[in-house]
């Protein structure tokens, strides 16, 4: 929010070897009117314009961009790997065997199989939920056998001591959930998938069998299958963490095998970003298709929505893409490598400065609202696109007064998104003619905030896009659950008042919890049968897998100085055996070769890594855009400083 890299005003950058978008264009900051006029001059009817969406932007913004450029010219702004993984996940959630659970459902599971994920670093809230999940079965046993009321937490904790419910983890490296796991299996992604397929076969003989499985894995698969089969609420968790479609399909097979007898099994997928699933459901072409379009001369102008391609694709490929395109327009809130190459940069608000909708990994549509307003040239992403469409005479944009209107058109184009209309009241919603106040009653000190400038309190900002007001004034009762801005009740402080907003203590909010599920699985998808071969490690080439870090791997949070201090520096992780095999004993650094790119990285010893596997931190500054899993070569170096060659 307060980063020095925030983009606060439109900017025009003239290329030295390409014609400008407008003959009167001048380099430097520009007004919103001027920059729209410049863009209008080039985005004429028949121009070859493509749009690249964003998994961290709202459904409204992505759909607006898709409408501007047309469905055939809309590309999902994900890496090729994430595109394949998210397409597979979306299809399984639509047609698969089991529903996706909410966080509360995860807490209530009584047996869990995690396949391929480091949840603490990739989905930390889910990891926290699992720490509560493993207490579920011991608590139920204590309540049933000892007749202890579940609300009597001290007695329940004394009764269960350190007992834990069954949690099985299969991951490419040791995770921080190992202390609560009944068993942990560390292996390459293909071997993780083979274990998953074997568990599915143990649960249902109709599922494809795995040939050549070592005896210890046969025994482990039988153990996992037996526990899941006896559970009342089994849960399978997988996702995009280890970058393997086979792992995702194996998790689907396990869930299908559990559901064959009507068992209420659930299947949860972790996804990379806040709206990754929403973008996948919206649909579009891959980033590789966009690169080919530009290379073949089929692209005049590229409009990028809240996306830094240098984090998703190797730098050389992005450089070629931006060179092949005649003009590049970037809509973003934070400057990066991509905005530095854009001819036109349009500043958009962050999640705290705009309204919109997103779809989480459960498939639940959720609405977010402005926390505060701003008084500069920033706009919501969809507003820039709408204003540009209006200047071009696009009829759809004429009726887009706010997010509600865009969602109405989205639902008309994609009926499966109809629950988006129900996730929050429309912008015109009022209770007794009043808006819902954002500010709590204790915000009365606001009158002194600007007293050094003027003793006259300024008029609160208007918000025509939501039923909320930027003031204390408004309806004082309980609003609909999706519009609750704070919890307070007489005699109850802060979040302690939550029980006054619930149907019952610990239950859902009155009127239902916010959000609506978009997807219910049809169950018509059969078993996947393409089982990968066992991983064969080679001494001259290793499989490089991503290591995620809760502090540092996420694109925007790492820009915060506090988070950046906790983020690790780039490294290459190896086990002790391969350090010796590769001649790295005593070496501080190693050279990693991925294709034509060479990285000099400090060596980090991780004894739990399987043979033939090495790891690098995903998304860490200095390693952005590195596409893994991938095969790579590692060799000793004598240089004393890390870097990229």
Predicted feature residues:
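Cofactor-/ligand-binding subdomain signature composed of acidic, glycine-rich
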Residues: 1-48, 107-111, 115, 123-127, ...
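Short acidic, glycine/serine/threonine-rich loops at helix termini
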Residues: 12-13, 61-66, 85-91, 124-127, ...
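A cross-kingdom feature strongest in bacterial/archaeal respiratory oxidoreductases
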Residues: 40, 66, 101, 111-114, ...
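Gly/Ser/Thr-rich loops at beta-strand to alpha-helix junctions
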Residues: 50-62, 118-121, 240-246, 309-310
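Anionic-ligand anchoring segments at beta-strand to alpha-helix junctions in alpha/beta enzyme folds, i.e.
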Residues: 52-101, 252-284
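A polyampholytic, Gly/Pro-enriched intrinsically disordered region
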Residues: 91-110, 188-194, 205-215, 282-298, ...
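Gly/His-enriched, cation/cofactor- and phosphate-binding structural elements
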Residues: 233-244, 248-290, 295-298, 302, ...
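Non-catalytic, well-ordered alpha-helical segments in soluble enzyme domains
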Residues: 381-401
């Amino acid at each position: 929010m307060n980063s020095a890299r925030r983009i606060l005003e439109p900017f025009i950058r003239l290329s030295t070897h390409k014609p400008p978008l407008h003959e009167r264009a001048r380099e430097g900051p520009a007004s919103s009117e001027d920059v729209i006029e410049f863009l209008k001059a080039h985005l004429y009817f028949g121009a070859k314009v493509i749009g690249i969406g964003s998994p961290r932007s709202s459904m409204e913004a992505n759909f607006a961009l898709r409408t501007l450029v047309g469905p055939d010219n809309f590309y999902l702004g994900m890496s090729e790997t994430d595109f394949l993984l998210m397409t597979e996940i979306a299809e399984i959630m639509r047609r698969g065997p089991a529903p996706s659970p909410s966080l509360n459902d995860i807490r209530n599971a009584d047996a869990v199989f995690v396949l391929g994920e480091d949840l603490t670093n990739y989905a930390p809230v889910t990891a926290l939920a699992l720490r509560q999940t493993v207490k579920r079965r011991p608590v139920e046993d204590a309540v049933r056998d000892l007749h202890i009321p579940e609300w009597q937490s001290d007695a329940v904790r004394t009764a269960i001591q350190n007992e834990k419910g069954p949690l099985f983890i299969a991951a490419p490296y040791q995770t921080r959930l190992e202390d609560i796991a009944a068993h942990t299996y560390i292996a390459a992604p293909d071997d993780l998938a083979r274990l998953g397929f074997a568990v599915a076969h143990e649960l249902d003989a109709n599922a494809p069998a795995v040939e050549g499985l070592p005896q210890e894995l046969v025994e482990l698969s039988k153990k996992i299958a037996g526990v899941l089969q006896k559970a009342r609420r089994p849960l399978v968790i997988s996702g995009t963490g280890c970058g393997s479609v086979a792992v995702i399909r194996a998790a689907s097979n396990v869930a299908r095998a559990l559901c064959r007898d009507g068992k209420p099994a659930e299947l949860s997928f972790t996804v990379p970003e806040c709206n990754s699933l929403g973008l996948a459901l919206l649909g579009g072409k891959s980033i590789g298709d966009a690169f080919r379009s530009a290379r073949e001369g089929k692209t005049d102008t590229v409009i990028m929505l809240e996306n830094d391609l240098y984090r998703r694709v190797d730098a050389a490929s992005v450089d070629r893409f931006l060179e092949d395109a005649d003009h590049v327009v970037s809509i973003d809130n934070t400057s990066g490598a991509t905005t530095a190459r854009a001819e036109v940069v349009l500043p958009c608000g962050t999640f705290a400065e705009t309204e919109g909708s997103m779809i989480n990994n459960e498939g639940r549509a959720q609405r977010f609202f402005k926390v505060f307003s701003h008084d500069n040239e920033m706009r919501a992403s969809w507003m820039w696109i709408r204003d540009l469409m209006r200047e071009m005479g696009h009829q759809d944009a004429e009726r887009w007064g706010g997010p509600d209107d865009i969602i109405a058109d989205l639902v008309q184009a994609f009926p499966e998104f109809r629950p988006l209309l129900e996730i929050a009241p429309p912008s015109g919603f009022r209770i007794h003619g009043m808006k819902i106040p954002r500010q709590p009653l204790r915000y009365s000190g606001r009158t002194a905030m600007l007293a050094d400038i003027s003793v006259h309190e300024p008029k609160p900002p208007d918000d025509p896009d939501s039923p909320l007001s930027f003031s204390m004034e408004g309806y004082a009762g309980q609003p609909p659950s999706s519009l609750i801005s704070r919890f307070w009740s007489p005699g109850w402080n802060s979040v302690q008042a939550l029980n006054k907003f619930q149907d019952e203590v610990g239950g859902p909010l009155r009127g239902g919890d916010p959000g609506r599920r978009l997807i219910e699985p049809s169950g018509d998808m059969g078993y996947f049968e393409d089982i990968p071969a066992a991983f064969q490690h080679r001494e001259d080439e290793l499989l490089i897998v991503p290591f995620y870090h809760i502090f540092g791997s996420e694109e925007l949070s790492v820009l915060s100085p506090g988070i950046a201090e906790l983020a690790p520096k780039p490294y290459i992780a190896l086990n002790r055996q391969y350090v010796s095999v590769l001649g790295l004993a005593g070496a501080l650094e190693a050279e990693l070769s991925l294709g034509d790119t060479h990285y000099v990285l400090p060596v980090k010893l991780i004894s739990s890594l399987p043979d033939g596997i090495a790891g690098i931190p995903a998304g860490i500054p200095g390693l952005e855009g590195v596409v893994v899993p991938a095969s790579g070569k590692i060799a000793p170096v004598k240089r004393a400083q890390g870097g990229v060659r």
